[in-house]
Amino acid sequence: QHYPMGGGFLAAHKDIAAIRSAKKLKLDLFYNCLLLMTKKGKDYRSGGGFVIKDNKVIDYEKFAKVGDVLIYNSKTLHGVLDIDNNIFPDIKTKKGRYIAAVTLFKW
């Protein structure tokens, strides 16, 4: 997934589709995996992935490096704060934040 400079974002959410799919498969819990492919401070300056725990926003990308795999519960509230929202958006840019994600989904 690409979150481009100029405001690429993902609103805070829980992975409802993964939660529903896990229930259909009679799983109580499912974990998502996310591979970080860019580095905050190098590939983009502001924004990035976060989780919300105990009503506090945690910027996990302050601590993470390129190649790190994050594993989190599908029920965790998470998202992406605007990537370099001080820059004018350019939908053709390849610059910004990149991740690869694996989730559970079943029709």
Regions found by a protein language model. Give the residues of each.
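Conserved double-stranded beta-helix
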Residues: 1-41, 101
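Catalytic core of Fe(II)/2-oxoglutarate
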Residues: 29, 44-107
